[in-house]
Regions:
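Short alpha-helix boundary/capping elements
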Residues: 39-43, 56, 100-103, 146-147
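C-terminal accessory module of base-excision DNA glycosylases/AP lyases that mediates lesion recognition
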Residues: 1-20, 24, 117-122, 132-192
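Short Gly/aromatic-enriched secondary-structure transition segments
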Residues: 45-51
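Structural motif
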Residues: 17-28, 38-40, 82-87
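Short, aromatic/basic-rich helix-turn unit that serves as a nucleic-acid recognition element
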Residues: 30-34
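Alpha-helical ds-nucleic-acid-binding substructure associated with the helix-hairpin-helix region
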Residues: 51-126
Length: 192
């Protein structure tokens, strides 16, 4: 694996502190990806910072050990952390349990110990809340923003635009506009 670099932040939220947290705490990045569905990128990736504010930490083992009803209440506190706070509380708790159990409570190990690209993808896919498209996008972010490119990275890296290409607020706006246009085209095709 090439040497891991660390960007100053990932410009996904519009909030400097939340953007820095995505870089400073690897679990925050994973939680952001888990939350990235049916809400804006900004809402999904600001979730880890708000969760940390509410809990006082982002420790995978501690989150995994929480009473599910208590975590659910934290997610539902206004403003809710997600459009579907109950479901996402469960996903994040399962994600944290996997990080704690399978990666020694160190989210960075998910990628830092992957010997090759296919293993990196398999490790990401093993995490609750991370499906195929999210894994590909995470691979792109790790490769393009953190220089995490183990042997065989090119075999699993996406060839389409992803959050890995977002390095500024302008790039995020362009990415989101492209994603909306793609979804509109798919809907139009489905109407036939």
């Amino acid at each position: 694996m090439r040497g891991m670099t660390t960007p100053a932040s990932l410009p996904f939220t519009g909030n400097d502190a939340a953007d820095r947290l995505l870089v400073d705490e690897p679990l925050a990045l994973l939680i952001g990806f888990a939350l990235d569905q049916q809400v804006t990128v900004q809402k999904a990736f600001s979730g880890p910072a708000e969760l940390k504010r509410r809990l006082g930490h982002l420790d995978a083992a501690r989150i995994a050990a929480m009473d599910p009803d208590e975590l659910n209440a934290v997610f539902r506190e206004r403003p809710a952390l997600h459009r579907f706070p109950g479901a996402m509380a469960g996903k994040v708790q399962a994600l944290c349990a996997a990080v704690s159990r399978d990666f020694g409570n160190d989210a960075r190990r998910v990628w830092s110990e992957a010997p090759d690209g296919p293993s990196l993808e398999a490790r990401l896919l093993s995490l609750p809340g991370i499906g195929g498209m999210k894994a590909k996008s995470l691979i792109a972010v790790l490769g393009k923003q953190f220089d995490v490119r183990p042997p065989g990275y090119e075999d699993v890296a996406p060839t389409w635009p992803t959050l890995g290409d977002v390095d500024s607020a302008e790039a995020l706006a362009s990415y989101q506009a492209g994603k909306r246009a793609h979804k509109a085209a798919l809907r139009e095709t489905a109407r036939g």
